[in-house]
Amino acid sequence: MPVEINNNNDQKSYCISVKNLVKTYGSANSKKNVIDDISFDIDYGTVFGFLGPNGAGKTTTIKILTGILQPTKGSIKILDKDIFKNNNFNEVKKRIGVITQNPSFESNLTVERSMELYGFLWGLGGNKNKDKVRKLLDIFELTSLRDTRNEDLSIGQRRRVQIAREFLHEMDLLFLDEPTVGLDPRARRNLLNYIKKQVELGLTVFFTTHIMEEVEYLCDQICIINKGKIIEFNTPHLLKQKYGSTKKIDITLHPPVSKNIYDYFQKLSSNSIDVENIENSENTFSITSNNPQHILLPTVNYLYQNKIQIENIAINDPSIEDVFLKALKNNNES
C-alpha cells in the first residue's frame, strides 16, 4: 500500500534519504571508513539497485538502513522519519520488509504452519491469515510443499518460503539482499515478476545482486559503490549513454572451432587499439570494441577466406554489466 507523502514547505519527500553517511571500524591508530561519506535519495515506488564488488560496503549499508548497525556519522530518513531520533525506527520497521541471505526457520514446523505463524505476528488472524498464506504458497509454487517440514526443504525451497512469508505483511519498503541466490531459473523469474507487480502498486525496493540481468529487468536507479564510496548514481539509460562509446560484437561460428581461429582472436585482442576485450564461450566470440565496423569487416573476411561458417552476428549496446565493470575499472585506475 503506497504511503502518503508529506510535502511540507514544498520540499520533496523520499522513501529513503541518506546524507553524508560514514561507518568507521578500528582503533584510533588504524581507523577505516567502510562507508565513506555517501549520500543518495530513493523515490517512492521505484527499484533502487545498489551494486558493488565484494567488500565494497553494500552489506554494511543495508545493516545501517535496517537498524542493525549504528552509523559513525550522517543522517538517514526512511518513510519521512529520521530513524535515529525519537525512537522513530520502531515505527518505521513495521512498514518495511527485509529478505537477507541467511534466513532463520522454525525447522520442526511445516511450511504452512510457519507461514501462518508469521502472519499472526504481523497481525493477521483467522481466515484472513489462512487465505493470504495459501495465496502466497500458490504464487511462489509452494502449495505441494505446504505439509513439508522446513528442515526437509532444499536450499532453494527454503529461499522461496522466506520470500513468501515476507509478503504476508503490508509494507511500503522492501530490502532485498541478493534474493535469487539458490533459486532455479523458473523460481527466479517468478520472483522478479512478482516484485515488479508490487512496485507498480506502490512498493519501493532496495535491491542488491551480482546478477546484472536482474538489474536490467527491475531497476529504475542504479548506485555503484566501490571501497565505501559511491562512484556512479543514475538511471540505467543514462549510465549506458555515459559508457556507451563501445559496442559488443557477438560472432557465433559453426562448430568445431579450430585453434587457428582462437589464435586469430587472441592476436586481435592483443594488437588492435579498437578492441577493449574479447571473451569466448564455446563457439561464440564476444568482442567489446569502440569501433565495431573497423573490427567486424576484416574479421568476417578472414573467416570467409578460411571457409569458417558463421551462424550469427549481433552488435549490441553496452549492458549494465559492461557499465558496472567499466565504472569499477575507471575508479580503480584513477
Please annotate each region the language model reported.
Residues T66:
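Helix-to-loop junction immediately C-terminal to a conserved catalytic motif
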Residues G74-K85, E91-V92:
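Conserved ABC transporter NBD signature motif
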Residues E116, F120, N127-L145, N193:
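Conserved ABC ATPase "signature" region
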Residues R149-L153:
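Conserved ABC ATPase signature
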Residues L174-E178:
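Catalytic Walker B motif of ABC-type/P-loop ATPase nucleotide-binding domains
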Residues N193-T288:
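ABC transporter nucleotide-binding domain
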